[in-house]
């Protein structure tokens, strides 16, 4: 069977109290809808249609890196109406997986099990259901005396007895495309919400003697939807626990998982140790045998193996093997450290490349610089890279020694094996193998009083 997926993502999400569409809110490092798309792709479906409505430009921008198609639901008239918008772009012979865009906890295994159940039973439609201890807010699955599907009753339309049912509709389905779209055209808005319910199409198909299957999943956690900020925080916590467990089982040590925050797409090599109060975000990649933390935050950075980073901040930085960073270092975007570099306490580096084995031990600012191999930058060194209008380059060639409290006024180049005297302000190029000193003469004046 040819598989397509339709993700319903047109809702406003009023309870989020936000200008953003609900599916655009971030959880575990990326927007909710990207978690759903990832699960669908991991389940083996490449043909994905997203139904957009409120904030469609934002949703489309978020998904711009994905190979998906969009259809527009101008008015939010229910789940059935949302699915109908996809009729023109889904082949009638397809089997379609339908799910909401606000369920970031969904896992590919649950979707695969649903699709396999649908295939084995050769059903026209299959509903993924879950038994929940607290089913409040969910539609209930009604079965006949033989346990077969009867219908789904939405909570607002349910009576007191029906509300006692624990088996709920997850909102995730498999359908024969041609038959579900035919049934949807016969649905109405005669219900408490005044909307076109997708669940009514199931009842119509049942009345037409079509086969309706139920796949009862044990993945209660998987189907949690996000409706407000409380649920967003709960989903964040669950996804972080999953990620931490995945990393620990793959050979990464987390000294205190409860205080460690690692985004879903982060990759970390084995025998790396993550100390407490560490945050690793975005698409960061860390090698093997590193020690990170405590109190470190790394965003969208590439870290080699055997790197030590203590109490520091890294943003879009690239760090080669065996570097030593911190404490209290700040590596800003486009910073590259080659192998064996030391960046010590209270050092800020921006848009610079630091050569193999070079050291910037403490209290320095390096911006728009290229530093060669084996360079030592003394305490208090500043690259003066900005004249109020433009940024300029500083170049330190191999084996340069910069004395403490040196100001390097860019553009400037210090030739290889050269030394600057402590306290100098260097504003002209220094030839190789040179000692450069620039100081005002020292004066001794008598004290008064």
From Swiss-Prot:
EC number(s) recorded for this UniProt protein: 2.7.7.23, 2.3.1.157
A GO BP term here is:
cell morphogenesis
Instruction: Tell me which residues bind UDP-N-acetyl-alpha-D-glucosamine.
Output: 8-11, 22, 73, 78-79, 139, 154, 169, 227, 332, 350, 365, 376
Q: Does the keyword S-adenosyl-L-methionine apply?
A: no
Keyword annotations of the record: Acyltransferase, Cell shape, Cell wall biogenesis/degradation, Cytoplasm, Magnesium, Metal-binding, Multifunctional enzyme, Nucleotidyltransferase, Peptidoglycan synthesis, Repeat, Transferase
Start and end residues of each stretch annotated as Pyrophosphorylase: 1-229
Cite the cofactor comment.
Binds 1 Mg(2+) ion per subunit.
Instruction: List the catalytic activities from the record.
Output: alpha-D-glucosamine 1-phosphate + acetyl-CoA = N-acetyl-alpha-D-glucosamine 1-phosphate + CoA + H(+); N-acetyl-alpha-D-glucosamine 1-phosphate + UTP + H(+) = UDP-N-acetyl-alpha-D-glucosamine + diphosphate
Quote the pathway field: Nucleotide-sugar biosynthesis; UDP-N-acetyl-alpha-D-glucosamine biosynthesis; N-acetyl-alpha-D-glucosamine 1-phosphate from alpha-D-glucosamine 6-phosphate (route II): step 2/2; Nucleotide-sugar biosynthesis; UDP-N-acetyl-alpha-D-glucosamine biosynthesis; UDP-N-acetyl-alpha-D-glucosamine from N-acetyl-alpha-D-glucosamine 1-phosphate: step 1/1; Bacterial outer membrane biogenesis; LPS lipid A biosynthesis
Gene Ontology CC annotations of this record: cytoplasm; membrane
Residues reported to bind acetyl-CoA: 379, 385-386, 404, 422, 439
Q: InterPro entries, from UniProt?
A: Bifunctional_GlmU, GlmU-like, GlmU_C_LbH, Hexapep, MobA-like_NTP_Trfase, Nucleotide-diphossugar_trans, Trimer_LpxA-like_sf
Q: Where is this region: N-acetyltransferase?
A: 251-449
Q: Name one GO molecular function term.
A: magnesium ion binding
Cofactor names: Mg(2+)
Where are the residues of the annotated region Linker?
Answer: 230-250
- Give the main location: cytoplasm
What positions does UniProt annotate as the active site of this protein?
362
The record's subcellular location field reads:
Cytoplasm
Question: Any idea which positions bind Mg(2+)?
Answer: 102, 227
On subunit structure and binding partners, the annotation says: Homotrimer.
Q: What job does the chain carry out?
A: Catalyzes the last two sequential reactions in the de novo biosynthetic pathway for UDP-N-acetylglucosamine (UDP-GlcNAc). The C-terminal domain catalyzes the transfer of acetyl group from acetyl coenzyme A to glucosamine-1-phosphate (GlcN-1-P) to produce N-acetylglucosamine-1-phosphate (GlcNAc-1-P), which is converted into UDP-GlcNAc by the transfer of uridine 5-monophosphate (from uridine 5-triphosphate), a reaction catalyzed by the N-terminal domain.
User: What family is this?
Assistant: In the N-terminal section; belongs to the N-acetylglucosamine-1-phosphate uridyltransferase family.
The protein's name: Bifunctional protein GlmU
Organism equals Syntrophomonas wolfei subsp. wolfei (strain DSM 2245B / Goettingen)
């Amino acid at each position: 069977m040819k598989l397509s997926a339709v993700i319903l993502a047109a809702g406003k999400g009023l309870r989020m109290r936000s200008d953003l569409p609900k599916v655009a809110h971030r959880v575990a490092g990326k927007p909710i809808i990207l978690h759903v798309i990832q699960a669908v792709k991991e389940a083996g479906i490449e043909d994905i249609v997203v139904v957009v409505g409120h904030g469609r430009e934002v949703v489309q921008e978020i998904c711009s890196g994905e190979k998906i198609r969009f259809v527009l639901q101008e008015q939010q008239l229910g789940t059935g109406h949302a699915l109908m918008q996809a009729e023109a772009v889904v082949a009638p012979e397809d089997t379609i997986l339908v799910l909401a865009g606000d369920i970031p906890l969904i896992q590919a295994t649950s979707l695969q099990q649903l699709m396999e159940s649908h295939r084995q039973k050769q059903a026209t439609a299959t509903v993924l259901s879950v038994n929940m201890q607290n089913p409040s807010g969910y539609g209930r699955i009604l079965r006949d005396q033989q346990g077969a599907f009867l219908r789904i009753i939405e909570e607002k339309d349910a009576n007191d007895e029906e509300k006692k049912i624990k088996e709920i509709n997850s909102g995730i389905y498999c359908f024969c495309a041609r038959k579900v779209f035919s049934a949807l055209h016969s649905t109405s808005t005669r219900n408490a919400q005044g909307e076109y319910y997708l669940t009514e199409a199931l009842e119509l198909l049942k009345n037409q003697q079509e086969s309706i299957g139920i796949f009862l999943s044990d993945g209660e956690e998987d189907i949690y939807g996000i409706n407000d900020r409380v649920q967003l925080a709960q989903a964040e916590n669950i996804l972080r626990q999953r990620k931490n467990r995945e990393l620990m089982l793959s050979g990464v040590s987390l000294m205190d998982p409860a205080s460690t925050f690692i985004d879903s797409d982060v990759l970390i090599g084995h025998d790396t140790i993550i100390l407490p109060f560490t945050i690793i975000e975005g698409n960061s990649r860390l090698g093997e045998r590193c020690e990170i933390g405590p109190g470190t935050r790394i965003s969208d950075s590439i870290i080699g193996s055997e790197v030590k980073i203590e109490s520091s901040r890294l943003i879009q930085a690239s760090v080669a093997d065996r570097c030593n960073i911190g404490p209290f270092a700040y590596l800003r975007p486009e910073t590259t450290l080659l192998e064996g570099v030391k960046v010590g306490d209270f050092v800020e580096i921006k848009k610079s490349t630091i050569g193999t084995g070079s050291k910037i031990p403490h209290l320095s600012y390096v911006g728009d610089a290229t530093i060669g191999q084996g360079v030592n930058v003394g305490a208090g060194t500043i690259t003066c890279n900005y004249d109020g209008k433009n940024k300029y380059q500083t170049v330190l060639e191999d084996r340069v020694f910069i004395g403490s409290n040196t100001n390097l006024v860019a553009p400037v180049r210090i030739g290889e094996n050269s030394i600057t005297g402590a306290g100098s302000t260097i504003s002209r190029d220094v030839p190789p193998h040179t000692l450069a000193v620039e100081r005002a003469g020292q004066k001794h004046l008598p004290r008064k009083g």
